Amino acid sequence: MRINPTTSGSGVSTLEKKNPGRVVQIIGPVLDVAFPPGKMPNIYNALVVQGRDSVGQPINVACEVQQLLGNNRVRAVAMSATEGLTRGMAVIDTGAPISVPVGGATLGRIFNVLGEPVDNLGPVDTSTTSPIHRSAPAFIQLDTKLSIFETGIKVVDLLAPYRRGGKIGLFGGAGVGKTVLIMELINNIAKAHGGVSVFGGVGERTREGNDLYMEMKESGVINKENIAESKVALVYGQMNEPPGARMRVGLTALTMAEYFRDVNEQDVLLFIDNIFRFVQAGSEVSALLGRMPSAVGYQPTLSTEMGSLQERITSTKEGSITSIQAVYVPADDLTDPAPATTFAHLDATTVLSRGLAAKGIYPAVDPLDSTSTMLQPRIVGEEHYETAQRVKQTLQRYKELQDIIAILGLDELSEEDRLLVARARKIERFLSQPFFVAEVFTGSPGKYVGLAETIRGFQLILSGELDGLPEQAFYLVGTIDEATAKAMNLEMESNLKK
């Protein structure tokens, strides 16, 4: 599938054919607009409301047509605040969907849902734009090769490996480390793979978006001296934005990623933080449009909306989009319709555990709940598969023994089980890892661990060769060699204290 870009500026498409209309009703971010007979806009067309507010300031609000109501009226959702709008204001139909800038000029820049730069660095140096509403690639254009996408994060690469060109979900409640993990992945992929990333901030905190931007400038992912050499484009529609912007900002980010895949023929990483906010915004818009709510108050079109976004994220014969999506889980309930609908589209799930975070084990990835369709011997190889299965079996047995340990203590276990518990605790700690993006908080330098080194480390723990080392030696280290060096340092410190 090739993009057929237009050559207008960013934001709404500026075609010659413009239909005049008038605002007849405003309900929050939803507008009803009347058009002359025979001049009705199409669904998803971009409308622009123009006029002046009560103090004479110009108003220029972009909207998207959602419903045709009859009697020459349409219902549209605003992409920015509707304060100052009044009935009777002039509305222009642009004749096309919202179009955003695409290509290399977007790298290192921050955009809003309309593709307008919001980083005070001036206009985007490109005339190439693309509409945000497009069909998914045809079946014959898809690439079906299976290969692992190495992240340098031990727990991910060993137990729930990511597929190149696949979709990965980061599941977790509030405050367990989803955004930090995403920042680390962007950092590792830019440094280890030299890949281009697009980050879609959908309905998350503005402070986090600002922190991410500053962090990227510090780490060199965004090149301050030469913006063109940056490795990521940022698209933000944060918590304070109207639901229309939060609902469409994911499509804006995806459109930019599709250009890198289809025209530049690159492998792209698309980060969406947070896909739940996309669903939440759709739910708000659905209620404002008067649709009957479905299960737990969600929109009846939940599966359709999710599918239209997710099916465009795929690998073609030109290139691939590997998507990593943070999924907020309401009240830590994985059966909620929003995370449950997301599950159906994913190749791998990385589940973050509040229990592990409470223990101080970061990344707090649950090794037993996290899954991947890639963890098969024919894809990852026998050695990787066997090591991962043995790690999971050891941790599962430790989990089963925890009730007995809590009631009776370790001494009541058999010798075999005591040994298993000791190894499981070492494994649990060795699954932790210092992050590059958390260096300023932890004081520990970040570590990128290759897959072969990860497998070797866990094999040594499982074999019993390291049974004599204290478990704290395995906490927040990179490779197994660092763990043995840390054990020697701990022993020396202990001897000095004596």
Swiss-Prot record:
Protein name (database record): ATP synthase subunit beta, chloroplastic
Binding site for ATP: 172-179
GO biological process: proton motive force-driven mitochondrial ATP synthesis
InterPro entries (UniProt xref): AAA+_ATPase, ATP-synt_VA_C, ATP_synth_F1_bsu, ATPase_a/bsu_AS, ATPase_alpha/beta_chains, ATPase_F1/V1/A1_a/bsu_N, ATPase_F1/V1/A1_a/bsu_N_sf, ATPase_F1/V1/A1_a/bsu_nucl-bd
Family: Belongs to the ATPase alpha/beta chains family.
Pfam families: ATP-synt_ab, ATP-synt_ab_N, ATP-synt_VA_C
Catalytic reaction(s) noted: ATP + H2O + 4 H(+)(in) = ADP + phosphate + 5 H(+)(out)
Keyword annotations from UniProtKB, A to Z: ATP synthesis, ATP-binding, CF(1), Chloroplast, Hydrogen ion transport, Ion transport, Membrane, Nucleotide-binding, Plastid, Thylakoid, Translocase, Transport
Function: Produces ATP from ADP in the presence of a proton gradient across the membrane. The catalytic sites are hosted primarily by the beta subunits.
Membrane topology according to the record: Peripheral membrane protein
Xref: PROSITE patterns: ATPASE_ALPHA_BETA (PS00152)
Cellular component, GO, one term: mitochondrion
Main location: plastid
Highest classification ranks of the organism: Eukaryota, Viridiplantae, Streptophyta, Embryophyta, Tracheophyta
Subcellular location: Plastid, Chloroplast thylakoid membrane
Keyword Translocase listed: yes
